[in-house]
Amino acid sequence: MRQNYDDRKIVKQYREIARQIVRKEGLYKNMDQDELREQTNFWREKFKTKPMTERDKINIFALAREAASRIIGLDAVVVQLIGALVLGDGKVAEMKTGEGKTLMSLFVMFIEVMRGNRVHLVTANEYLARRDREEIGQVLEYLGISVALNESGLDKDQKKAIYTADVIYGTASEFGFDYLRDNMVRQKEDKVQSGLDFVLIDEADSILIDEARTPLLISDRKEEDLSLYQTANELVQTMMKDDYEIEEHKRFVWLNDAGIERAQKFWGVESLYSAEAQVELRITMLLMRAHFLMHKDKDYVVLDGEVLIIDPHTGRALPGRRFNDGLHQAIEAKEGVEVKEESRTLATITIQNYFRMYKRLSGMTGTAKTEEEEFRQIYNMDVVVIPTNLRVNREDMPDDIFYTKKEKGRAIVYEVSWRYEKGQPTLIGTSSIKSNEWISSLLDAAGIPHQVLNAKNHAQEAEIIAKAGKRGMVTLATNMAGRGTDIKLDPDVHKLGGLAVIGTERHESRRIDLQLMGRSGRRGDPGFSKFMISLEDDLLEQFESKSWEKLSTKLKRKAPRDGKPVNSRKIHSVIVDAQKRLEGANYDIRKDLLSYDEVIDLQRKMVYKERDQLLERNKLGVSSEKILREVAEYSFIHPLELEEEELEKYYSRQKELLGGTKFPISFDQVTLMDPVEVVEEIVAWHKKERNKFPVETITAIEKEVYLNLMDQMWVMHLDAMVQLREGIHLRAYGQQDPLVMYQKEGAQLFEKFQADYHFYFAHALLELDPDGLIQG
């Protein structure tokens, strides 16, 4: 994207600072390693008591620049230093691919460590984390900064050691899962993650935007009648188009009156929306989503009898990841493979809410400006476009637009064939496995050798991308496979025009299109890009517009059948409009996800805070006597204020509180006593029994029981919140705002959760045996 006025103003401001940094290169030239490390220690100590000035910043950058020059032979140029200064301000730096974002990261990490912050560097995958840790990590270590790699599969002691480092490389999911696991431990000493000071996110658009729709989940198996999925599959297979309404771009489908009648007859229920039919309704809706919204070889792939999710932004399969809340089981039933048990959520957080917990956040990527509003609204980060060091030498051609996919296919083959004949390497980008395999079959038929990269062979990704810049190589890849790695050109390819990029469809996001184009023309290399699209492409097929339908019909009716592209400003404007609308719709989905998660996020923070305090003190925050008194008063005295018809549930509550405990007064006797007297008897008896045990023993027992109950009830509460959210969306076509309903009913569920674990803790207190153990 081009710079706007604000970008130019910021870049101009920082350009002079960057030039001063370069002019300082002689300052540290004659120092040996020990002397450079002394400088590092000097700055670290200074900023423990004093603020950092602009002059300090210039000297610190110059120190890191000298170290990079010595260790990896790279002298940071002015634009890289400008980018680092932007990152230091907590912004997103948009820097073209190949311009040196990895080196740029060195400076902001080094200066944040000097400020006393622990730094997390987040990358898109473990391969990139390992690569960057090795390259930039050695520079930081040369200066006396400790660096670690946070990988999956490490044990607790290894994780604890990693989190003592000044700079830690890893993936978003690994940092997020460490946070969730830390809030499931039984002892304070078992926590591994230290403070969340500063995080720098590479490929920030991919992690903070594209991955934001998928929450991080820790789960276990949930008992469920899996045969219901196959049964519901039979129902959905019989449905006609008249049975449901669909808004595919919003990923929403619902039953109309005819569909409701069909489903009620199938399940044998009077009302599909009654409490008795909740399970049948839920699984029916899941199978409808699986059949009508989830598409094989686009949203998922079936390999070796297993359904694998396809990352919509990279085209990669995601082994081990499953769609949430029964959708994966529904797809398995649809595809006729084994339906595996649904998972039960033990802990969850969205990418958005995890990273918003850091004190400071910044990001870098090749494409972010189109999503600036989202970065600003959700993460409070502006996007600044950093100029390139060398002029971009890529020729970006206008789109070739064809009436049909068939005509487009023929034109793509012709375009690729003549480039192949002259030896120019070509990268063909597709949006799905289906279109990837279709183009591959056309190239095969034309006798054009090529390599294919999609979710079905992602294991060979690095090898395939490494060959993509070779003379005469044709590479066919889904979306942005290979992002984060350079396509290096053979020396003799430059005179052939560099790498040619052919896009076969416009994507839902303009940003993904820009990423594909950005694979070519790096660091001043020559290059070429062009999109070859048709009126039958998915983007336009799902674009609901009467004016477009009218224009499309008119164009197809008048279309000359010569296979030549049509150049129409109207079509171009429709495509841009479609992308903007879909970007807006996807942003709304992510914003909606965040709005709902903020309800559970507030609750999660309250629970985790209480948990932390419990682990820190190693005992209850309030006395067990106080909790028992509150529960007893609510169970016995509160009902005095109620009407007769409300009393029944309190009789059951009283019985449950005392039933099976060691409390010496029988329930029959209790019902004849004054409620206030009952409460005092309960509290007095507990106090007497508690005093029989050593203080350390009873304190440890109370802490362990309280923690157990809170954790168990929290898992049940998370499940209840999932069910509530699903139900709320099914009621979304009523008069009430579903989010407001979710907030209100979610708060009620949270109050119930708190009351429940206090109640069962009080019950457990009355079960203490003489040995100080809890029975039951």
Curated annotation (Swiss-Prot):
SMART domains, A to Z: SecA_DEAD (SM00957), SecA_PP_bind (SM00958)
UniProt subunit comment: Monomer and homodimer. Part of the essential Sec protein translocation apparatus which comprises SecA, SecYEG and auxiliary proteins SecDF. Other proteins may also be involved.
SUPFAM superfamilies attached to this UniProt entry: Helical scaffold and wing domains of SecA, P-loop containing nucleoside triphosphate hydrolases, Pre-protein crosslinking domain of SecA
Protein's recorded name: Protein translocase subunit SecA 2
Compartment(s) of residence: Cell membrane; Cytoplasm
GO function terms (MF aspect): ATP binding; protein-exporting ATPase activity
Record-listed ATP binding positions: Q80, G98, E99, G100, K101, T102, D486
Domain of life: Bacteria
Primary residence: membrane
